[in-house]
Amino acid sequence: MGKTTVALNASFALARRGWRTLVVDTDPAGAVGLSLTRRMAEAPGLAEYVGRTRALRDVMVQTKLRELSILPVGRVQVEDAMGFQNLLADGAVLGRFLAELQDRFDLVVFDTPSGFSGSTLGAMRVSRHVICPVQAEPIAARSAVRILEVIGAMRERGAHVGLLGFLVTMLQNGDASSMAVAEDLWRSLPKELILDTTVPRDGAFLEASAAGVPVGLLRRRAPPAALIFDQLAAELEARAGLTASREGQDEPIALVD
């Protein structure tokens, strides 16, 4: 399971918990749009906003869930991908973008390309929190610590970004190799840097991706895998201090009068 699957499903779960959430695709490959519908994959989006050919209100997509909106990456030709990434790298453009949003959203989730360049660095420079999915596979786990160095360097230069946590994904409880990678990660990093929630390898995620929906909308009665992202959303709320911002607004609900 990759970053886009995590971004979409976590955002959906957070939106269902009442947070006004915007998912922004900064990957020139258009991973968010490709994960949903062909129409969204071909729609104008961030690239057109950045190029000043479309207003922000014209490129944001309102989903059927009122609290969830999506900004696809837009039409980025292969030959223009590097220039697009370079344009976002210093964070200035994305900073202006966030300023224009003002108070319309509680959460803005950037789905970025893999690696530490271009739009990934730009998004990190303007963000408060980073979630780093780490597949429970040897190659992916070896690169996990690199993000701590990048965040540290950014903070030394004045950025406010911090690591909300590593999210272990594709975990196979019955597979010795998969468990060994996860256990090595749990052993080598401070406990507070690793999210308690883990995402298993589950066919429901592939099925949902093929259907172009979050796993929570795969069927009218959501599969058990959807509960994992509900748990993740609750954990992210607590770690990011979101619940404190609504203290006093979340009272017990009586079951009967």
Segments predicted by a language model, with ranges:
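Walker A/P-loop phosphate-binding motif and the immediately C-terminal alpha-helix
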Residues: 1-29
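Active-site signature of alpha/beta-hydrolase-fold catalytic machinery across serine-
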Residues: 9, 13, 35, 122
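Conserved catalytic-core segment of NTP-binding enzymes
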Residues: 16-17, 22, 102-103, 107-197
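Conserved nucleotide-binding/hydrolysis micro-motifs of P-loop NTPases
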Residues: 28-29, 76-77, 138-139, 171-175, ...
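C-terminal lobe/tail of nucleotide-utilizing enzymes
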Residues: 156-257
